[in-house]
Design a protein with these regions (language model features):
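Beta-strand-turn-beta hairpins that frame and shape the catalytic cleft
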Residues: 53-65, 151-165, 193-196, 250-256, ...
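Core catalytic region of metal-dependent phosphoesterases/phosphodiesterases
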Residues: 78-156
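C-terminal motif of bacterial Sec signal peptides marking the signal peptidase cleavage site
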Residues: 16-19
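Active-site glycine-centered loops adjacent to acidic/histidine catalytic or metal-binding residues
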Residues: 69, 99-100, 129-130, 202, ...
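His/acidic metal-ligating clusters that form di-metal
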Residues: 85-94, 123, 163, 173-256, ...
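Bacterial N-terminal signal peptides that target proteins for export
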Residues: 1-8
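Binuclear metal-dependent phosphoesterase catalytic core
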Residues: 23-45, 187, 246-288
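N-terminal active-site segment of His-dependent metallophosphoesterases
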Residues: 21-110
C-alpha cells in the first residue's frame, strides 16, 4: 500500500511538471543559487555604482514592445523578429523582456547578438525569470544584463515622465530586502508626479490555470502583500510572464497582465505592443 502511494505521488509530480513543456527538471532541482536576497544585493551594488536610466521618447505618445518566455535554446527566429520590429518603430525608445529569456544552458551572448548591429534603438530592459537562474546561471545573467532589480524613467518631449519598476521574482518570492526596496521606491515615486507607474516582473500575481505546476509561484500571503503595496502607491499596471498563457486581471484599480510566451515552438506566439500616452493602451501582435 505504501509503495502504491509513493508511485502515485511520483506520477502526480511528473504529470504536473509535464505541463511546462520545456521545463528542465535537472536545472530546477539543482537549485537556483544565489538566493533572492543575494541577487538583490548584487543588483543594488551595480545600481549604486551606475544609477538608474532616464530614456527620452521621441513623442508624447510612444511605444514600448514587451515580450516574455522566449526560452531561447538553439534557435532565436521569433526573438530576432521582435528585435527587428521594435528597432524599426520610430516612436519606440525601449523594449522589455519579462524573463525566461533562455532555456536550459543557453549562452546569454547568443541572445544579445541581434542587439549588436548598429542601431539608435537598442535599449532592452531585461527581467530575470526562473529559467534564467536554473543551473546556477545567475552569474551569466548578471554579466549580460547587470541587474535584476531597478527602475527606469522615460521622459517625453512635453516633459511627462513614466516610471517602470523592475523587480526580481524568478524563484517565486521577492524576498524581504527587495520588498523593502520596492516599498521605498514606490513611496518616493508616488510624490514625483509621474504620469504612469508600471511594474515589470516575471512571476504573475494571480495563478489560475496551474500550467506551471509548483515552479516559482508566490505564496498567497506574499501575493496579498504585493497587491496591497503596489495598489497603495498608484501602480497602474503590472506586466508579467511565466504562465505562457495570456491573462488580464483588474483588481484595486490596477491591471495585471500576463503576456503570451514567444518561443520558437509556440503555435500562437504574441508580443505586447503598448502605447504610453495620456492613457496606457495595449494590443497583442502575432509573431510569424
Amino acid at each position: 500500500m505504501k509503495t502504491n502511494i509513493q508511485i502515485c505521488l511520483v506520477l502526480l509530480f511528473f504529470s504536473t511538471m509535464a505541463s511546462c513543456s520545456r521545463l528542465d527538471m535537472i536545472g530546477m532541482i539543482s537549485g537556483t543559487s544565489p538566493t533572492i536576497d543575494e541577487r538583490f544585493e548584487q543588483s543594488q551594488q551595480y545600481n549604486t555604482e551606475h544609477g538608474f536610466a532616464t530614456l527620452h521618447a521621441p513623442a508624447d505618445n510612444y511605444h514600448v514592445y514587451v515580450c516574455t518566455d522566449t526560452h531561447i535554446n538553439g534557435t532565436r527566429k521569433r526573438w530576432e523578429e521582435f528585435v527587428d520590429a521594435y528597432r524599426a518603430d520610430d516612436v519606440c525608445p525601449v523594449a522589455v523582456h519579462l524573463g525566461d529569456i533562455i532555456d536550459a544552458k543557453t549562452d546569454f551572448n547568443y541572445v544579445k547578438e541581434p542587439l549588436l548591429s548598429p542601431s539608435p534603438k537598442d535599449t532592452l530592459m531585461a527581467v530575470c525569470g526562473n529559467h534564467d537562474i536554473y543551473f546556477k546561471q545567475w552569474k551569466n545573467f548578471i554579466a549580460a544584463f547587470k541587474t535584476s532589480t531597478y527602475y527606469f524613467v522615460v521622459k517625453t518631449p512635453s516633459g511627462a515622465r513614466d516610471l517602470f519598476v523592475v523587480y526580481d521574482s524568478a524563484d517565486g518570492t521577492v524576498g524581504s530586502k527587495q520588498l523593502q526596496w520596492l516599498e521605498n521606491t514606490l513611496q518616493w515615486a508616488s510624490k514625483q508626479g509621474f504620469r504612469h507607474i508600471i511594474g515589470c516582473t516575471h512571476t504573475h500575481l494571480f495563478k489560475r490555470d496551474g500550467s506551471q505546476g509548483h515552479t516559482s509561484n508566490f505564496t498567497i500571503e506574499e501575493t496579498y502583500a504585493l497587491l496591497d503595496l503596489l495598489s497603495k502607491y498608484g501602480v497602474e499596471m503590472v506586466w508579467s510572464g511565466h504562465d505562457h498563457v495570456r491573462e488580464i486581471t483588474q483588481v484595486r484599480g490596477m491591471k495585471c497582465i500576463v503576456v503570451d510566451s514567444m518561443k520558437d515552438e509556440d503555435k500562437e506566439p504574441y508580443y505586447m505592443l503598448v502605447t504610453m500616452g495620456k492613457y496606457v493602451n495595449y494590443e497583442f501582435v502575432a509573431v510569424e
